[in-house]
Amino acid sequence: MVPAFIHFMAVDSPIFNGVLIQLINETMKAEEHMFLVGGKDAYIRLSKQYKNVVYEPNFQLSTIQKYDTGREILIVHSMFLTSTELCCLETKQLKRLVWCVWGHDLYQKRENRTLKMWVRNWRADRKIGDIRAIVAGFKYDINEIRHRFGKSVPVYNAFYASGYYKDDVDCIVRNYQRTDARTHIMVGHSAYSFLQHEKIFRQLEKYKNEDMVITLMLSYGDKEYATKIVEDASKMFGVEKLNVIHNFMTWHEYIQLLCNIDIAIFDFDHQAAFGNLILLSYLGKKIYLSPTGVMYRAFKTENSEVYSCLDIGRITFEELRTKKQLNTNTNYAESLLNKENIITQWKNLFQTIG
C-alpha cells in the first residue's frame, strides 16, 4: 500500500520527531504514514515498534525524488532543502509539499552577500509561497511566514508534543521533594551562541556573592562554544556555583531539574526553546526574555507572566528572583500540554491537506 503521507525528518530529534511518530501511529491510521528519519539511534528504537519507520542517512532534493511516486503528500519536518534545491522543485511537487516549520528554519541568517545569492533566496521564497501548506507549531510564527512567503499559502497550527503531558508533569511535581534552598538560575537550553550566555553572565556578575546556582544545559549544540562558556562561567562565579548538564536527560529527569529552577533566562529575538518555555511557564518559574523578541510578545499576548532581560543586573537580587504575581495565568502553557488538543490539531491537519 502506498502511504498517503511521507514524513521527511532530517533533524535527529528523538524527542519531538520520535513522539510525533508515536502519536500518529497510536492514535491515527498508521498505514497512511511513512516516516524517514535521519537519526540512526532513533530509527533502531522506533523501528522495533513501528513498521513504517525507515532510516534515511541523506536528506537532499534527490531524497524526495527517491521516495516520491507522484501521489503522496510530502511533509518536511524542518526545511532541509537548500535555496537552490527549492528552486529546482517541479510545480506538481510543490503542490504536494507541506513544510512543518522549526524555529531555526525561519530565523537563521541567510547568505545575501551577492546579487546572485539574493535572487536565489528570493526565488526560493516565491517557490515556498506556492506549496500546499505551512505548519507552525508556534502560532506567532505566522506573521513572519506571511511576511516572507505571502498571503496565498495556507498556514495551519500543530504543536510538537514532548511526550509528557499535563497529568504526567503534575505527577512528577507531586512526587518530587526539593532539598536545595539556593536560588537556581537556568541560562539558555543548549550550547548555541544566539543564547548569549556571556552577555547574561556579565549581567549576573552583580549577584555572584549571592546564594545561587547557575544551571547550563549543554547536552546539544556547539561543543567548542560549550567548553568556552563553562570556562567563562567558572572564572566569573566559581565552579561551586555551576550545575553543568552535558548528557541528555530523560524527560522525567528534565522535569525534576526544572522543579529546582527558580529563574530562567532566554535572551534572543527569534522563536526557539518553545517547549522549554512552556514547561517553565506551567511550573510557575520566573522567566526573563528579550523584550524585543517574538517569544516575549507571545507570552504577553497570552497573558502569561514574563520579565525583561534588560532588568538583569539593574535590580536587586531579591527583585530578580521574586515574581510580581504569585498566581500567574498558566492557561496558555496548559493548553499546549493537553494531549487531546495536540492529537486533534494533527488529525485536523491531515484531513485538511490529504
Question: What would you call each of these model-derived segments?
Answer:
Residues T316-G354:
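A charged, aromatic-enriched C-terminal amphipathic alpha-helix characteristic of glycosyltransferases
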Residues I15-V19, Y192-K206:
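A conserved mid-protein helix/loop that constitutes part of the nucleotide-sugar donor-binding site
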Residues G129-D180:
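Donor nucleotide-sugar binding/catalytic pocket of nucleotide-sugar-dependent glycosyltransferases
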Residues I229-F248:
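Nucleotide-activated donor-binding/catalytic signature segment of Leloir-type glycosyltransferases, i.e.
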Residues I64-S83, R96-V98, I263:
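Short N-terminal targeting/anchoring amphipathic segment
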Residues T114-I134:
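Membrane-proximal helix-turn-helix segments that form the acceptor-binding/catalytic region
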Residues I172-L195, I214-L216, E334-S335:
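Conserved donor-binding/catalytic core segment of Leloir-type glycosyltransferases
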Residues I73-I75, E90-E111:
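Active-site proximal beta-strand in glycosyltransferases
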